[in-house]
């Protein structure tokens, strides 16, 4: 039984899963919306919404926390700056639910259910 397991493994080992979520989070922050599979989007939603909630309090510790969660490269640095300076202030009066998942189609080839994940209000 998988009661209270807490997260999806997505068919990957932990390091690969962490890298996948970091890359998807950077893509979502940079572009505002991305298309991916439903299980990945549901995991990404939890990951990104925690970052945005933490980013509402913009201090040095927040910058370091978000940067560490998004990786340590130039892309993560730009994404950190964008989430703290642009995205988090838009959701200042919102207590959660910063993203929306819209189911779109079934992928040709493996029939995986695809969806679009985007920020609310964009």
UniProtKB/Swiss-Prot annotation:
It comes from the Bacteria. One of its GO terms (cellular component) is cytosolic large ribosomal subunit. Keywords: Ribonucleoprotein, Ribosomal protein. InterPro entries: Ribosomal_bL17 (IPR000456), Ribosomal_bL17_CS (IPR047859), Ribosomal_bL17_sf (IPR036373). Disulfide bonds: none annotated. PROSITE patterns: RIBOSOMAL_L17 (PS01167). One of its GO terms (molecular function) is structural constituent of ribosome. The keyword Membrane does not apply. One of its GO terms (biological process) is translation. The keyword Ribonucleoprotein applies. It holds the Pfam family Ribosomal_L17. HAMAP family: Ribosomal_bL17. Part of the 50S ribosomal subunit. Contacts protein L32. Belongs to the bacterial ribosomal protein bL17 family. This is Large ribosomal subunit protein bL17.
